[in-house]
Amino acid sequence: ASDVYKRQVKNAEGYVAYVKEASASDDAYEKLDDTLIRQYADYWRADALGLKEGSYVMKVTAVLKDGKTVSESTSSLEVEKYDRSGFAFSENSKFQTGSGAYNDDGTLKKDAQVIYVTPETAKTCTAVVNGKEVTGFQSILDAKQSAGTKDTSPLDFRIVGCVTADDVDHFSSSAEGIQLKGKSAYTEMNITIEGVGEDAAVQGFGFLVRNSGNVEFRNFAVMAFMDDGISLDTKNCNIWVHNMDIFYGSTGGDSDQAKGDGSVDIKGASTNVTVSYVHFWDSGKCSLCGMSDSAEFLVTYHHNWFDHSDSRHPRIRVASVHIYNNYFDGNAKYGVGTTKGSSAFVEANYYRNCKNPMMSSMQGTDALGQGTFSGENGGMIKAYNNITVGASSLIYALSLIHI
C-alpha cells in the first residue's frame, strides 16, 4: 500500500480502504469508514478498528482525477488482542467485562453505534438514544444518563485528531469537563471512548465518571486537564482505562496542584477497575485510590509506565489492589502508598530511582519522620519479585536492613 501512496498521491483525489481476513475471498472486503482515512503532511493513513485477533489484508484504492482507480493490497497483517485482565474482567464482578461497546474478542457489539468526535464534529456528531436523535458529544452522554436502563445499547466514541475544550458542545462537569454518568449506581452503560491512530488527544478537559458500569477508555492522550484527567468518582464498576497517554493538568489552587490534581482517581465506591498500559507523563499526583471510602473495593494496575511522576502510584485507602509489571521511573516522592487498612499486592515491578518505592503510613519509611506521606492508620503491602534500583529507603517487616 505504501507504494500506491508514493506513485499515485499527486494524481489522486482521495482514497478508499477495505479490510478482510487473510483467508477470506475478495468479496469479503469491508469498506472502512471515510473518517478512518486521514491525510498527513507527507502520507495518508488508514486504521481498521474492531478486528478480532488474527491475520488480515487491507486493500487501498486511489481515486484519480480522471475517474480511474488504482488498487493495491498489503501482505498479511497480524492483529493482536488487548490484554483483558485484572479486576475489571473478574467473573465475580457485576458485568464481568470492561470492554464497553466491544465484545471481549475485540469486535464491536452487534447493535453498537459509532460516533466520530473530531475538532470539527464534536458539536455536531449525532447518535440515537432512547429512540431520539441527539447532537453533540456531551449532549449524547447526557441523554444516555437520562435514559438509564431504558437504553443500554452500546456507544463507541472515536476521537480523531486533537479535540480541545472549545470544540465541545458543552461540559456537564465544571470541575473535570466531560461527564459520563449513569442514572443510578452501577448503571450498565456499554460505552467506549477511544482514539484513532497515534495522534488522538483531548486538551483542556478531562472526564468525570459516575454511576457507570462497563466503560472503556483507550488509545488517546489527555492533556492540560482541568482538575483530574479521568475521575472515577461515584459508584462505578467494570471500568477499563488502558493504552493511554496522560499528561499533567492545569495548575490548581492548592500548593500540591502545580501539575493539576489526579491523573486517574478512583473513589466513591468505584470497584472492579483495571488501569493498564498507561503512560503517565510527569504527573504530580498520579492515582488516588480511595478517598472517604469505608468498604473494600478492587483495583488492578498493570503494565503502566510512571514516567517521572511524583507520587500516588497509587495512594490507597481501604481497597484491595494488585499492582504488577509496572515501571516506576524517576519518581520524586513515593511509589505505592497504603493507609486505612488497605491491602496491596506489589508484584514484579521495576523501580528505577523511585525515592520511596513502597510506604505504609506511620510505619517503616514513613516513620522516619520525613513527612512524606500520611498520618492515617497504615495498610498492608505484600511485595514479591520486584526489582529496585536507586531507592532512598525501602524497609521490609522482620528485617534489620533497609536501603
Predicted regions: what is each one?
Residues A1-Y5, I403:
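Short, small-residue-biased leader/transition segments that mark boundaries at the very start
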Residues A48-G67:
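Beta-strand-rich modules
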Residues S85-T97, Q113-I115, E120, V128-E133, ...:
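Long, ordered, amphipathic alpha-helical scaffolds
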Residues M189-D199, G213-A224, N236-G252, G262-S263, ...:
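Right-handed parallel beta-helix
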